[in-house]
């Protein structure tokens, strides 16, 4: 290299505060990354500071070039470019050459170890070590509180946003570090002791929580790993600094969606609030299987958003695929809970649905050949999971299933009715534990509570929400507010967003699904009436006490000309009449027939009664020509009565 080039390199060294070899490596890294292919370079001087990836890029290059980890605010078009088909955002990590070529909106960032996940902390050790080489600085108070944050491009406390924005135009401004108390400095020779202390903290037993809860600020809105730093003035409110989940300011932007058909209308709205990230997920499907079946579910994740997101994408599919979906929806729903839990425990394949292959820290670490880190991630007990509160509306039936503390509340003429009971450690879990087992051996179950009920005209709406709402409002408060606002003519969308806003003080994420039943769409279930039955053709009442209307129990239903194949189709809601001889009203013919010697056949949830001839209750129904091999036969005797009829129906 000529003398001019050598002088230029020395000048860059003086500007950047890095060694000449580091500057040269940066130039090589830049060309390698821009070229998008493997680049061989001499790393003999950095052999202890690098770990080669499968495509021969040193881990240092990845750490310096990419902001790995998924960010909720990330937009590739506005935040950065796509390097090597990886959706990582270019950030200011002490590489002015990259930032000069690829300016982005926000380039101040920090890396913070995820709370409660000490198993993969070592995966960030190498990155922290390499980033610290790039003139990083650690605050003493974070170190004392066990917050292993990796902060680059720090600024003085109280610096305004304008100071940070102005620094973008000056590539050297990012290298000007605050040499405050406890800082590392600009050279790497002081790093050894700090890194040793950092490593020693991996044996902590406090769950690995490294969140910064101090009252001082460095002029940033601190987020944990994977989020941006909002460079601005310090937050003066200690309560907000010590918020329940780590944010200095709540994220009050809401996601809202609504749809309707001729029977129901739903609105779903969600808000991150004070949560450090959004761990709620939901599913709202108006037509689940191209029928009048609707599905609604809210899922409140803990330990991360992955499980909740997986449930929102997969639960209703498991439900539809179950063999009992058509015949026994309650059983299918219970089985879906078990199936989801089994999928989550037996394999990590489900993560493919919620962690994009080209946009996540896991794939970044795999690309960097950190095999030991990846293995350690999944070998320890899982600390992530999700609640589930799901509602299925099929025809005139409402089925609710839930596990956890998400809740479903029904408004019936303005009165709140809880359709679920929260599962909390201080409630039914106390009854389920085995007192002879130590706490670490006590098991929790995914067995859900299932409720099935008929929809009636006095039902107004359902509110399905995560814990964020119910922490601040009672069931009746929610119903009163929604009911009053509907009477005022407020839009359902506005009402749902108001409910979400009520969950802000809880410090948790909040998701609300509001389901409105349209008037007249769900007729009330006819009450049991032993006096009269209405003829569906003439509208005349049939008095069962009138001797003229009595039916001979031994009479054949074949006398009805409209009865084909000697069968009468009976609706599932047909009412049994009498006690000594069981009778029923055919839904389409309103013909009273005898069940004393009849054989009931169930096909696709319809009841068929063969009364063309006397049938032995123990005989096979094969004598009925209309009976197919797929039909299920149920025998009824004269002593069945109303309760037996209901029992027969409930079993199918």
From Swiss-Prot:
CDD domains: PP2Cc
Positions with a binding annotation for Mn(2+) 1: 300-301
Binding site for Mn(2+) 2: 300, 467, 508
Keywords from the named record: Hydrolase, Magnesium, Manganese, Metal-binding, Protein phosphatase
GO biological process terms on file: signal transduction
Enzyme Commission number(s) of this protein: 3.1.3.16
Catalyzed reaction equations: O-phospho-L-seryl-[protein] + H2O = L-seryl-[protein] + phosphate; O-phospho-L-threonyl-[protein] + H2O = L-threonyl-[protein] + phosphate
Alphabetized PROSITE patterns for the sequence: PPM_1, PPM_2
Names of the cofactor(s): Mg(2+); Mn(2+)
Keyword Protein biosynthesis: no
UniProt-annotated stretches for the region Disordered: 524-567
One MF annotation (Gene Ontology) recorded for this entry: protein serine/threonine phosphatase activity
Details of cofactor binding: Binds 2 magnesium or manganese ions per subunit.
Key word Cell cycle present: no
InterPro entries: PP2C (IPR015655), PP2C_BS (IPR000222), PPM-type-like_dom_sf (IPR036457), PPM-type_phosphatase-like_dom (IPR001932)
Domain PPM-type phosphatase, first and last residues per copy: 265-517
Origin: domain of life: Eukaryota
The family this protein is said to belong to: Belongs to the PP2C family.
Name the UniProt record assigns to this protein: Probable protein phosphatase 2C 19
Taxonomic classification: Eukaryota, Viridiplantae, Streptophyta, Embryophyta, Tracheophyta
């Amino acid at each position: 290299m000529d003398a001019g080039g050598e002088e230029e390199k020395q000048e860059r060294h003086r500007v950047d505060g890095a060694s000449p070899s580091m500057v040269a490596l940066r130039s090589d890294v830049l060309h390698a990354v821009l070229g998008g292919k493997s680049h061989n370079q001499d790393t003999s001087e950095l052999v202890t500071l690098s770990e080669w990836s499968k495509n021969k890029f040193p881990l240092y290059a990845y750490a310096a070039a990419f902001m790995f980890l998924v960010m909720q605010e990330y937009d590739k078009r506005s935040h950065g470019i796509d390097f090597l088909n990886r959706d990582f955002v270019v950030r200011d990590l002490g590489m002015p050459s990259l930032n000069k070529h690829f300016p982005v909106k926000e380039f101040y960032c920090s890396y913070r170890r995820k709370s409660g996940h000490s198993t993969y902390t070592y995966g960030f050790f190498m990155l922290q070590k390499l980033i610290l080489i790039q003139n990083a600085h650690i605050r003493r108070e974070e170190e004392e509180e066990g917050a292993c944050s990796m902060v680059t491009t720090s600024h003085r406390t109280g610096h305004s946003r304008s100071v940070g924005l102005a620094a973008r135009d000056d590539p050297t401004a990012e290298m000007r570090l605050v040499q405050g108390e406890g800082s590392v400095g600009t050279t790497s020779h002081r790093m050894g002791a700090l890194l040793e202390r950092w490593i020693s903290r991996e044996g902590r037993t406090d769950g690995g929580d490294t969140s910064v809860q101090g009252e001082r600020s460095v002029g940033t809105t601190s987020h944990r790993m994977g989020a941006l730093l909002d460079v601005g003035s310090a937050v003066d409110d200690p309560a907000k600094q010590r918020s329940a989940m780590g944010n200095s300011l709540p994220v009050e932007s809401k996601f809202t969606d609504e749809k309707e058909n001729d029977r129901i209308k739903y609105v779903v709205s969600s808000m991150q609030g004070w949560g450090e990230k959004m761990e709620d997920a939901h599913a709202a499907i108006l037509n689940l299987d191209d029928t009048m079946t609707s599905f609604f579910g809210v899922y409140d994740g803990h330990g991360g958003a992955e499980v909740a997101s997986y449930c929102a994408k997969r639960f209703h599919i498991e439900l539809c695929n179950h063999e009992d979906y058509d015949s026994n929806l309650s059983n299918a729903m219970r089985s879906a809970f078990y199936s989801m839990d089994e999928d989550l425990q037996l394999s990590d394949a489900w993560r493919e649905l919620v962690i994009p292959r080209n946009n996540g820290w896991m794939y970044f670490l795999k690309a960097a050949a950190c095999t030991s880190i990846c293995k350690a991630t999944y070998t320890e007990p899982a600390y992530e999971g999700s609640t589930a509160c799901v509602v299925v509306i099929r025809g005139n039936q409402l089925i609710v299933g839930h596990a956890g503390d998400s809740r479903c509340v029904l408004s019936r003429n303005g009165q709140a009715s809880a359709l679920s009971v929260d599962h909390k450690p201080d409630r039914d879990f106390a009854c389920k534990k085995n007192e002879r087992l130590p706490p670490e051996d006590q098991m929790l179950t995914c067995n859900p509570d299932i409720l099935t009920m008929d929809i009636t005209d006095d039902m107004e709406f359902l509110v399905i929400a995560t814990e964020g709402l119910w922490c601040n409002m009672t069931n009746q408060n929610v119903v009163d507010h929604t009911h009053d606002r509907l009477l005022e003519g407020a839009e359902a969308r506005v009402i749902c967003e108001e409910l979400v806003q009520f969950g802000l003080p809880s410090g948790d994420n909040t998701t609300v699904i509001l389901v409105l039943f349209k008037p007249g769409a769900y007729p009330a279930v006819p009450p049991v009436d032993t006096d009269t039955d209405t003829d569906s053709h003439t509208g005349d009442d049939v008095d069962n006490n009138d001797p003229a209307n009595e039916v001979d129990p031994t009479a054949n239903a074949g006398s009805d000309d409209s009865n084909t194949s000697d069968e009468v189709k009976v609706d599932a809601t047909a009412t049994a009449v009498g006690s000594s001889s069981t009778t029923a009203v055919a839904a389409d013919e309103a013909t009273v027939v005898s069940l004393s010697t009849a054989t009931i056949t169930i096909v696709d949830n319809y009841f068929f009664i063969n009364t063309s001839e006397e049938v032995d209750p123990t005989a096979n129904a094969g004598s009925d020509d209309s009976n197919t091999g797929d039909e299920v036969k149920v025998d009824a005797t004269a002593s069945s009565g109303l309760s037996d009829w209901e029992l027969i129906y409930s079993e199918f």
